[in-house]
UniProtKB/Swiss-Prot annotation:
Family affiliation: Belongs to the DEFL family.
Protein name as annotated: Putative defensin-like protein 225
Cellular component annotations (GO), alphabetically ordered: extracellular region
Database matches in Pfam families: SCRL
Cross-referenced InterPro entries: SCRL (IPR010682)
Length: 92
């Protein structure tokens, strides 16, 4: 009985260690990020438009994998259009 419990605990510890290594490697892949506001709303075709808008910026990486998220920001003044804020992660 003691050996069975010891085996189960050691398997659990190894699982935790191995899963942490995978998270560190994933963070290394998309380690850099940038945030930029754009006019308009996010829309339905969000991901493709965000990535293309970000790649048009001179400071954005051109030939790298990029992941973007978009959120709408309401306008602060009446009559002014709202904007969308894109936060993108890319490989350094």
């Amino acid at each position: 009985m003691k050996y069975g419990v010891l085996f189960m605990v050691s398997c659990g510890v190894m699982f935790l260690i191995l899963s942490h290594v995978e998270e560190v490697e994933a963070m290394k892949k998309f380690g850099c990020n940038t945030t930029h506001p754009f006019p308009g709303k996010c829309g339905n075709n969000g991901k493709s438009s965000w990535v293309s808008d970000m790649k048009k910026l001179p400071s954005a990486p051109k030939n790298r994998d990029i992941r973007c998220e978009c959120s709408d920001r309401p306008s602060l003044a009446r009559g002014m259009p709202g904007e969308r804020v894109c936060r993108c992660d890319y490989d350094c």
